[in-house]
Amino acid sequence: MLTDRQLLILQVIIDDFIRSGQPVGSRTLSKKHQIAFSSATIRNEMADLEELGYIEKTHISSGRVPSEKGYRYYVDHLLPPQRLTRADIQKIRSVFAERIYELEKLMQKSAQILSELTNYTSIALGPTFKESKLKQMQIVPLNEQTAVAIVVTDTGHVENRVVTIPSSMDAGDLEKMVNIFNERLNGVPLIDLKEKMETEVADVLRRHIRNYDSVLNTLIETLDAPEEEKVFFAGKANMLNQPEFSDIQKVRPLLDIIEQEKDIYRLLRKQTQKGVRVSIGHENELRGMENCSLITATYSVGDEPLGAIAILGPTRMEYSRVITVLNRVASDLSAALAKWYQSQ
């Protein structure tokens, strides 16, 4: 159990290190107005905090920096509350005040405002793709043998596949096929499309179009393929602006994680409980994120969490501001999604 004096010194050390990025020594602490102790007392308390594992020495300075244990205690018990400025609130409101017709644009804008307000890398995981509905289908001929099948969902998600056109099928057959698809499948949830295409739509096509099988099977594959929600990033390059990541060899594994996206997707998909979660350093299960903190928040419609937004940055992160921004964006995004779903 830390004493009140130790708690104060720990908080001031972490606040100062987050702000400056420089190790904090007893001389620096003695100049802080909230620290009214002698230099000897400060040194003794810092030695105790180091022995307890909350702060640690660096090789390049006599000062101390927070350890992962120190950051965890700070986030759980010492985090000072922070309010957003009017300008911040207005920026967030302006994003969600716009009328947005495609869900993917809404998610991308959410990622952008998070990155802009925090100067870290932001991530937004879209709502479950299988909950989307078919909005429109097109088949665009490329030549006599091939065409591109384009599928658009109500969220703005677009999938396309190259399909082989049977020699017995002409442009009129393709047009008729597209009309049947759009008439029978518009508004159908993607999760139900495969069954509907294999039964009801196939029966109609069988009566009107010869050799429809190969085109239909390719379209079924196109609609059945995307099982992972889309991940939206903003501010990827912000990582390189952090002093901790100035060594490109150290940051390369992290950049690989960001570029591959799948690992980040799986990480965010596990965030199903409402609220904010903070993972610090080695608490992150992905190799390459040992020097990072990942702060995630869920967004929802009603009581149902739909997805997550997150901020990825160094362990020397402005936790209070990031958590405040995430909470506000998650709240406004949830409200915007509720309106969007009601309008569909």
Curated annotation (Swiss-Prot):
Gene3D superfamilies noted in UniProt: 3.30.450.40, Heat-inducible transcription repressor hrca homolog, domain 3 (3.30.390.60), Winged helix-like DNA-binding domain superfamily/Winged helix DNA-binding domain (1.10.10.10)
UniProt-recorded name of the protein: Heat-inducible transcription repressor HrcA
Family listed: Belongs to the HrcA family.
Function noted in UniProt: Negative regulator of class I heat shock genes (grpE-dnaK-dnaJ and groELS operons). Prevents heat-shock induction of these operons.
InterPro entries associated with the record: GAF-like_dom_sf, HrcA, HrcA_C, WH-like_DNA-bd_sf, WH_DNA-bd_sf, WHTH_transcript_rep_HrcA_IDD
GO biological process: negative regulation of DNA-templated transcription
Keyword flag NAD: no
Disulphide connectivity of cysteines: none
Statement: the UniProt record of this protein carries the keyword Transferase: no
Keywords: Repressor, Stress response, Transcription, Transcription regulation
Record-level Gene Ontology MF annotations: DNA binding
UniProt-listed HAMAP family: HrcA
Superkingdom, taxonomy of origin: Bacteria
NCBIfam families: hrcA
Source organism (scientific name): Geobacillus kaustophilus (strain HTA426)
Pfam families the record matches: HrcA (PF01628)
